[in-house]
A protein has these predicted regions:
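Histidine-centered copper-binding motifs that mark active-site loops
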Residues: 1-169
């Protein structure tokens, strides 16, 4: 029995694969600058991650942990196509964004989960500037710990009639 398993509970390896053999190495997250109307493809899938002297099996968006950082301008709309090659059904929750309910990523409430091998298309609007994040809302204890999360940077709409303020992100 796995030393982390609780009495009466099966070890996690009985539920989720753990072997990293043959998996691509996880990469660092890319900074993706998206314009209004752009399409983004996010692929969820297993990756190998080196942690000191051990290689472990994790999950990534587009092969990276964390997932890509998305940089958009306030008021933009982006189409996000998510394909699930992960371990279990999933959704993507766009944490803190005000958006259409059907794209909020709450399983069985606002969206049917994306099955393994399936896809879902989100239409995401960015009404407010700020720093946000995205992540699954199914088995968060597992999926986020395995690497499924990423940042969203929403830049404010430039104010007209005044000189722009220097911004460095």
């Amino acid at each position: 029995m796995d030393h982390h398993a609780q009495p009466g509970q099966p070890a996690s390896a009985e539920f989720f694969p753990t072997d990293p053999t043959g998996l691509p190495e996880a990469t660092r997250p890319a900074l993706l600058e998206l314009a209004d109307g752009d399409d983004l493809h996010l692929q969820i899938g297993p990756v190998a991650k080196r942690l000191e002297d051990t290689t472990v099996r994790m999950l990534g968006y587009n092969g990276s942990i964390p997932g890509p950082t998305l940089k958009v301008r306030q008021g933009s709309e982006v189409i996000v196509h998510v394909t699930n090659h992960g371990d279990l059904e999933t959704t993507v929750h766009w944490h803190g964004l005000r958006l259409e309910n059907k794209y909020d990523g709450v399983p069985h409430e606002t969206q049917t989960p994306i099955p393994v091998g399936g896809s879902f298309t989100y239409r995401i609007r960015f009404p407010d500037p700020g720093l946000y994040w995205y992540h699954p809302h199914i088995r968060e204890d597992y999926t986020q710990e395995m690497g499924l999360y990423g940042n969203l940077l929403v830049l404010p709409t430039p104010v007209t009639g005044r000189p722009p303020t220097a911004m460095s992100f």
